[in-house]
Amino acid sequence: MGFQTKKIFAIILLLLLFVGCASNQMPIDAKKLIKKNGLMYKPKLNIKILGAGEAFTGKAFNYFKSGVKESEGTYLNGKKDGSWTYWHEVFGRDIVESKGYYKLGNRVGLWIYWYPNGEKSEVGNFKSQGRVGKWTYYNEDRSLDIVINH
């Protein structure tokens, strides 16, 4: 094998490696993920280097049929993990519906919810067993509705 052939082979190999690594970092449409035994998996593709069939780790997103973003967040080993944001679908606008964190598929820490008009609706914390501590609920006109201790 000549020097030129080895050089071309090395470049092709590096490109394949780069494409394989980069594809794991790019956000994926969550509707393309496959749910199996409570975990989200990458769809099986013909290109083995993409990590097809593995529990998904990375950023994912969903869109409503209208094209408005529905959700965006990260998965770790097939479970929601990290920051997630959900949106309302309001007349083609993307109004935030809720923001919070997941740990191994469970909501944890501070979560904030908003009405479709953009006003805050509820604020509180989650632990793996559900809502905990003080939760504050608001009316759409910003007035306090109720405070509940869970």
Segments and roles (model prediction):
Residues 10-19:
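Bacterial N-terminal signal peptides
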Residues 19-150:
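Glycine/tyrosine- and acidic-biased, solvent-exposed loop/turn segments at the edges of beta-strands
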